Amino acid sequence: MKVGHRRGILVAGFWAVNATACASSYVPPSKLGPARQETSWPVYLGTPRHDACVAESLNADPRLLWRADVGRAVRGSPAIGETVLVVGVADRAVALVDRATGQALWRTRVAGTVQGGPLLESDRVYVATEAAPDAKLYALRLRDGQPIWSTRTESVVAPLALDGDTLYAGTETGVMLRLETDAGKIAWRRPLGGAIRAAPVPTPDGIAAATTADTLYLLDRATGAVRARLATPGAVLAGPALDGSRLYLGTTSGRLLAIELPALTVAWDLAAGDAVFGAPAVARDTVYALARNGTLWVIPARQPAAARSFALAIAATAGPTPLASGVLVASVSGEVLLVDRGSGAAAWRVQLDGPIEQPPLVRDGQLVVIGGRGDIQAYR
């Protein structure tokens, strides 16, 4: 017990929170953001089902509202609040942007590129960086970008996941982390096989984490112990969608799977025709997925035999975005299409610079797209 205690102290010291150091490099911004946002963005794409935009509609012919460059290139998916959005930038920064004007309110330097995108919770922004050997997880103040705390970790490229007062992160070295959000203390570290590129998923039964070693794990929330594991037909590179007791995911070998929790048994397995790099989404009782060859899949969650597919004649690595008025998809060549879910016909399209690597998002009728040059474009 004494040896274990000393080892725990050494580990805790090495992965210690470094709030003083990060505060010393902070430069106050000339513009301030809001003190808080009422709507949270706690997981990749906003909700566990990836259906944050399902009640939204677009105008019949959306027009460019603004275009913003906030650095060399935006990486990852944005976190969208009611008045602002937050993005990670390739030149080691996080930026807060006014949704009405596209004006950058502040930029904060961080230790590496934010590949997985930020999370937004009330008066805080959470980000993790890709860097070796000094990657960090941060909590930033929404109003001015000032670091509240930072914690050293291995390099992180996967999106984070927030669950109450707990933050989960998966590293490039295949380690899952649980952190406390009040001060950034690491509660546990669980080494897994393979790198973690997909967002971890907090579920009622534990934390689901997929690795590039073609394995899906279910970890105990309290300890990080492995409760179940499943060999997947290919790697899972985007966060699974969670709906009740099921996970829905796509793999690099072109399979779409429904996985039952907590045993991680396969409820159904459907051939998508090509690799699936983007995250599936669940809207009401239907699963939406987009294969690399541009095939849009519309799958009744409980009747997969009734699945329909539409060849959209695009190449895609981003997942689809279900709306009330259709399904948004984006291509590696820069096209954004609004697709009719009944016929597969394109009701609207716009050409941007490609590749578009993250799903387009809509809030309050405003379409937000991260263009291929790393700029942010808003349409209404």
Predicted regions and their residues:
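Extracytoplasmic/lumenal domain signature
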Residues: A23-Q37, V43-R75, A79-Q115, L119-R380
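Sec-dependent bacterial lipoprotein signal peptides
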Residues: M1-S25
